[in-house]
Amino acid sequence: CLLCASLCAVAQDANFYIYLCLGQSNMEGNARYEAQDTLVDARFQVLAAVDNKELGRVKGEWYPARAPLCRPNTGLTPADYFGRTLVENLPPHVRIGVVHVAIGGCRIELFQKDKCEEYIKTAPDWMVNTLKEYDNDPYTRLVEMARIAQKSGVIKGILLHQGESNTGDKEWPQKVKSVYDNLLADLHLQADEVPLIAGEVVNADHGGVCAGMNEVIAMLPQVIKNCAIVSSKGLSCAPDHLHFDAAGYRVLGRRYAAQALHLMGIELPSPDDVCKHTVAAPTNMHGSDFPRIDKDNRAYFRCYAPDVKRLQADVCGKKYEMAMDEHGWCCLLYTS
């Protein structure tokens, strides 16, 4: 037993940060991903929770975190740019992995161990086939995959985006707490080491049809001490005013990452902060404040081009994909 424990300890990489992602359709991914969303740093990985023949993914194996992360025929999720942003802002030796289980249209009860079976009995017909992909038990699949992930890295947090189907449910925070507590117990995690990061639904400022649920989501930190809430203020959405659009998911993912980094004691720099703490680098882009270099030899690129669909930074002939956020196109690189 001692030998087995030693071998497991050696195999586990303390610099491989694992995040569990669960929820309903906005975590599942409702927006069509674009070319910029399919290119990803090798340091960002996804553990397939279901087989995906189209992408050649096998359940329980690690792959580059190229969209779609959840299942075949799903779209862009907050986790996509959550992982990208962490990779951009953490040292090069740190890798990020996500374990992703989400079911469109589900109530939080689907992830409650003592409610799942009863919930599935009354699940709508359109949800049945999706549930079968998780053997009719998404919570158990999440735990199963999380245990596989723990052999490779360390679980650093749990990302939740759910609530639309529980709109107005004042008991929702306690129900979420039961899911969180069960995950901690089943995976032998400590609450003070593994925060829950929960996102708001489409905001009232964009006509969110479930925006009233954000008042309930705001109550989560009252029942879960190690909890952070991700604002949806200002995020663009789909015409149904229920789901975010691709641009909204990208920014939402960065906001999730900003909360995770904050909990690590790292603040995600704003463009103004970058300018204050960096120096301009030589460039042929006359009159531009970017690129800039900081004391850790990180290069910041930023460009405002709202009508462009894809943008790359060209550094010595090597091209790096830039990502869109609320301030424009951006890219952060470690330089030697």
Language-model features: locations:
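Bacterial Sec-dependent N-terminal signal peptides
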Residues: 1-12, 271-272
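Cell-envelope and extracellular/periplasmic
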Residues: 12-271
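N-terminal pre-domain segments of enzymes
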Residues: 270-295
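Structural beta-strand segments of beta-rich domains
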Residues: 297-301
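Short proline/glycine-enriched turn/loop motifs at strand-loop junctions of beta-rich domains
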Residues: 304-309
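Short beta-strand segments within Ig-like beta-sandwich modules, predominantly Fibronectin type-III
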Residues: 321-326
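Conserved small/polar residues in nucleotide/adenosyl-binding loops
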Residues: 334-335
